[in-house]
């Protein structure tokens, strides 16, 4: 298993002028942007392991068995997914719910305790699949993932102009918006790329800070993130913006 920093997309308002010039007519694979936690699921010599986006390990035995069965015959690989917890989860504000669950699961794993998660409530929205030692474009990676019958996010092929309309619809339904990726693009580990785009079309709101979450790792004994609440009672977790 080879650890790596994930590829990151850019917010629409951070795109360079060159990308914006052709955005409306460029075709993208468009999916719902869920508000959850990105996780890695790796297969190494037949062993299935679960990791946070910064490579802290936890475990879900029943889900591991399902994935092991699905990936029978595959080489070593990495599944990248947005993890949510609870029926109909994944809407704006749901990230805080799953974050706490993953933290507890990580602590239990380090202590050798059983998995603390109700695995029936775990939702894995798989959006990428990388076979070790390969360099395939997005379309090719999705074809490979479908061969193993992995539960992928639903995608639709549409122009950037139509994706903006679609993202507004998703925002009205309570989601963050839409994720766009150029079908022929290649995965660049550790890079923030112009061909993976976050469309977050939602109204602005005044938020009140109701608490803080402690940092971990190099941020132990520091503020890790702020808990903010809007006028409807929805809670979101955001980075503090504080430097080291």
Task: List PLM regions with ranges.
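Classical nucleotidyltransferase
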Residues: 31, 37-81, 187-244
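Charged, flexible boundary elements
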Residues: 1-25, 30
């Amino acid at each position: 298993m080879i650890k790596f920093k994930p590829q990151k997309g850019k917010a629409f308002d951070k795109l360079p002028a060159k990308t914006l010039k052709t955005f409306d007519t460029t075709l993208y694979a468009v999916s719902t942007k869920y508000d959850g936690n990105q996780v890695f699921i790796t297969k190494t010599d037949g062993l299935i392991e679960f990791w946070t986006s910064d490579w802290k390990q936890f475990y879900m035995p029943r889900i591991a068995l399902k994935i092991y069965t699905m990936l029978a015959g595959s080489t070593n690989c990495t599944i990248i997914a947005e993890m949510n917890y609870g029926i109909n989860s994944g809407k704006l504000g749901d990230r805080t719910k799953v974050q706490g669950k993953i933290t507890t699961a990580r602590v239990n794993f380090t202590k050798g305790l059983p998995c603390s998660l109700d695995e029936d409530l775990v939702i894995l929205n798989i959006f990428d699949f990388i076979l070790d030692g390969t360099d395939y474009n997005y379309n090719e990676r999705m074809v490979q993932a479908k061969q193993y019958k992995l539960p992928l996010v639903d995608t639709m092929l549409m122009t950037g102009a139509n994706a903006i309309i679609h993202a507004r619809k998703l925002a009205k339904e309570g989601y963050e918006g839409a994720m766009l990726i150029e079908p022929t693009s290649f995965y660049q580990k550790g890079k923030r790329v112009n061909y993976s785009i976050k469309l977050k079309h939602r109204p602005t709101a005044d938020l009140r800070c109701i608490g803080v979450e402690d940092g971990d790792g190099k941020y132990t004994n520091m503020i890790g993130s702020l808990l903010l609440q809007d006028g409807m009672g929805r809670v979101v977790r955001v980075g503090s913006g504080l430097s080291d």
